[in-house]
Every structure is written in C-alpha cells, then in structure tokens.
C-alpha cells in the first residue's frame, strides 16, 4: 500500500517550480532595491511566542496552530506566520544595536490547521517584509510602494490596494466599546464563531464571510470615525504619500486583520480571481509588538504574500523552464562516451546540455530533443568521430551544418550565446 501526502500539504512539482522560483527571484530583486535584507528563521518556535504576539483569543492560536511537546516537555509550534519569528530574532540578536532602522524580508513555509480549499492550505508559503524603527507615515507608503512594485514586476495586475487604520492603544478601546454596543442587540443574528468573537475579539466580527454576519454588521460604526488626532493625522499622511507616488488605493473601513498586534495602518492586496480567498497580500503597522515580546519600544510595519495564491493568479502565465542549449545525440558506444564527457564540459561552461543515456535510435533521440525544446542538437556517431566533425542542427529553423570537434566547446558557447 502506497503512502500518500498529508491533506492540505501539497507537493510542488517540477512543472510549477519555475513559477515559484520566478516569484521568489523577483522578491529578492525588488526588495533589495528598497534596502531590505533577507533573514532566515526556524520553522519551529516556542508556543508562547505566538500566544503573546498573535493573541490568545485569535482563531489562529485557538484553533489553527500545530502545537506539540518535545521530549523535554517544551511546548513548540510550527510557525503559522512570519512576523513574530522575525521579531523574536531581531530582539534576541539585538539587531537594533547594529542599525536603528532594520529592513528585513523572508520567505518560506507556514502551517495552520485549516479546512483545505482553493488558495488556503495547511502548509502554505509566504514572502514577507518588515521595516523596523521608523514610525513616519512615509515608511508606510514606501512599504506599500514596494508591494505594488512587486506585483507589477511579476505581471499580476488584477489586484486592488485596500487601506485602513485600526487606531492605537488610545483610541481603539473607544471603537471596541462602540462596536460591542452595536453588536449587543444583534447577537442572535451572528454565527456561533462571531458570538464567541464578540466576547474575545469583536473586531474580527467585521471580517466574517458568513452572509448573515455581513448583513448584521453592514451599519456598524466605522473605526475611522473614532481615531484619535494622532492616528487620524498619520492615516491622512499615508494617503497623501500614496497619492504623491500615484498609487491607487481604496479605503476599506471594514478591513481588520486576524492578528492582535496590528495598529494604525493596515492594508490588503485583494482580487476577485480567487473566490472567498480574495487577499493575496496583507499587512500593517505593529508599533507595540517588539516591546510586547521583551524588546525595545520600536515601531514596525510589514506584510506577507501568499505564494500559492500568487501562483494561482499567474494561471496561464506559468513560467516555462529554460530550454536546453544543446542536446547531444550520440550513436554508438564510443560516440556516447565522447558525448557524455563533452556534455559535462559544456555544463561547466554554464550551458544547459542534455543527452539520452540509453542507446536509442537517432530518431528517438531527436524526438526527445524536441520534447525538451532544445535549441540545438549535436549529432555524433562513428563517422563524425573519424572525420573530426559533428553535425549541428538548429531546432528552430531546421538548418544543419558541420562543426569541428576541435574547440567545439567554445564554438557552441559562441553559437548559443549569440542567439
């Protein structure tokens, strides 16, 4: 009996990997343009880290984390998101002492025990970025500009930027009170999850996708009406900077985030292409998180993108693997040995070279070269070995010409690099 993979944890097959690598490669390129440096953190952290950062009453902590005790009875958790581990590393290694402004990015797998569906999996991958040490609204705008730049670079244009402000410790309690007062008379219209959220995390009721809950909250008070003057000014400046950069955005006062650490600016990149999983990137400011985790009182802002959702959005634009530069078709044992050694030398010159390893007919080898979409085929047999000249076929136009075996590596290098 064969062993299958774990539900909601998917294999990334070679036919898809090129698209994944393209998305990752563009993240490296774009983020470095904005002064961000990559950081890599473990996939397992102490459970306490996520309880203190994400919030003990969030859906993630209450229902979705993969948590276990190790053999020393330490409670550990597979990371459900990337910001908290990056902040833990930032504090532990005192990165603020090296530079008062830290701009970091990461990529890798995250884990949540959820019902698998399109765009939502139990192991999923994120690309994220964090800017620490600056509370200026201009930094919010730069992070959003970088995110928009990335989407342009990877060719995903059917997205909209939604922005909101969740206020701060001074004004959010007033909004929470206004919202719970509004919801109190409508509790019977809320789903079971939202009735629980009413007690623990009422802002999350606004994010519920259940139609009855959306109807019940359609006239709920707006957080933007209860911002303190500082948060109101901050949000106004963020919007002004976005306008200066000619970045389109939509104010979405109902947009809340599922993690407790967010303050002030929050945002999402949304699409209508993925059904209910309409956010392909999301983030916000978290000015109290680092202090909450035992570090200095430093502000921060960041975001994460779901790579699986980006891949889905690429759709028909899937990135194709690079074609082989040369396919070596050999007939006979001596020619096969010569081709094998030549293939290695070509690969050492950074040429993509392939050959058939089982003694197939020339016709079969040509079919293989065609399937691989090789640019050239080098045909080598006993006659070619004796004459010192092989045959080189251009697979794009069908032309064929002799090519000397002496110095063939340099000749093929010039030939392929010239096309």
From Swiss-Prot:
One GO CC annotation: cytoplasm
SUPFAM superfamilies: Class II aaRS ABD-related (SSF52954), Class II aaRS and biotin synthetases (SSF55681)
Localization per Swiss-Prot or TrEMBL: Cytoplasm
Gene3D superfamilies in UniProt: Anticodon-binding domain, Bira Bifunctional Protein, Domain 2
Assembly behavior: Homodimer.
Family classification: Belongs to the class-II aminoacyl-tRNA synthetase family.
Database matches in HAMAP family: His_tRNA_synth
Descriptive protein name: Histidine--tRNA ligase
TM annotation in the entry: none
Key words, A-Z: Aminoacyl-tRNA synthetase, ATP-binding, Cytoplasm, Ligase, Nucleotide-binding, Protein biosynthesis
InterPro entries reported in the protein's UniProt record: aa-tRNA-synth_II (IPR006195), aa-tRNA-synth_II/BPL/LPL (IPR045864), Anticodon-bd (IPR004154), Anticodon-bd_dom_sf (IPR036621), His-tRNA-ligase (IPR015807), HisRS-like_core (IPR041715), HisRS/HisZ (IPR004516), HisRS_anticodon (IPR033656)
GO molecular function annotation: ATP binding; histidine-tRNA ligase activity
EC number: 6.1.1.21
The organism's place on the tree of life at top rank: Bacteria
UniProt organism field: Syntrophotalea carbinolica (strain DSM 2380 / NBRC 103641 / GraBd1)
Catalysed conversion reaction: tRNA(His) + L-histidine + ATP = L-histidyl-tRNA(His) + AMP + diphosphate + H(+)
GO biological process, one term: histidyl-tRNA aminoacylation
């Amino acid at each position: 009996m064969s062993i299958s993979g774990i539900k909601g944890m998917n294999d990334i097959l070679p036919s898809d990997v090129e698209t994944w690598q393209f998305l990752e490669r563009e993240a490296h390129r774009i983020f470095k343009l904005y002064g961000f440096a990559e950081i890599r953190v473990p996939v397992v952290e102490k459970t306490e880290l996520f309880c203190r950062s994400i919030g003990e009453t969030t859906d993630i902590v209450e229902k979705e984390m993969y948590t276990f005790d190790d053999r020393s009875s330490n409670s550990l958790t597979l990371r459900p998101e990337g910001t908290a581990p990056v902040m833990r590393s930032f504090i532990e290694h005192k990165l603020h002492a090296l530079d008062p402004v830290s701009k970091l990015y990461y990529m890798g797998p995250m884990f949540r025990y959820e019902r698998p569906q399109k765009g939502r999996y139990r192991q999923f991958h994120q690309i994220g970025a964090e800017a620490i040490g600056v509370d200026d609204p201009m930094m919010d705008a730069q992070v959003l500009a970088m995110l928009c730049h990335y989407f342009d670079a990877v060719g995903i244009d059917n997205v909209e930027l939604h922005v909101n402000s969740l206020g701060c410790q001074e004004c959010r309690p007033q909004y929470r009170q206004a919202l719970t007062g509004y919801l109190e008379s409508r509790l019977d219209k809320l789903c079971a999850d939202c009735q629980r959220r009413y007690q623990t995390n009422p802002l999350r009721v606004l994010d519920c996708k259940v139609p009855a809950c959306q109807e019940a909250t359609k006239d709920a008070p707006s957080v933007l009406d209860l911002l303190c003057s500082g948060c109101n000014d901050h949000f106004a400046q963020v919007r002004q900077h976005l306008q200066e950069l000619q970045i389109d955005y939509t104010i979405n006062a109902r947009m809340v985030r599922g993690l407790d650490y967010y303050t002030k600016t929050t945002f999402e990149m949304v699409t209508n292409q993925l059904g209910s999983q309409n956010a392909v990137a999301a983030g916000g400011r978290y000015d109290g998180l680092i202090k909450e985790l035992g570090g200095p009182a430093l502000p921060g802002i960041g975001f994460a993108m779901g790579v699986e959702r980006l891949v889905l959005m690429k759709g028909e634009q899937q990135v194709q693997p690079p074609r082989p530069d040369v396919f070596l078709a050999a007939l006979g044992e001596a020619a096969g040995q010569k081709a094998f050694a030549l293939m290695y030398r070509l690969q050492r010159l950074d040429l993509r070279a392939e050959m058939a390893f089982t003694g197939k007919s020339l016709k079969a080898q040509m079919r293989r070269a065609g399937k691989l979409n090789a640019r050239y085929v080098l045909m080598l047999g006993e006659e070619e070995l004796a004459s010192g000249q092989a045959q080189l076929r251009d697979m794009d136009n069908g032309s064929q010409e002799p090519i000397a075996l002496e110095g063939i590596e340099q000749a093929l290098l010039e030939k392929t690099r010239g096309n």
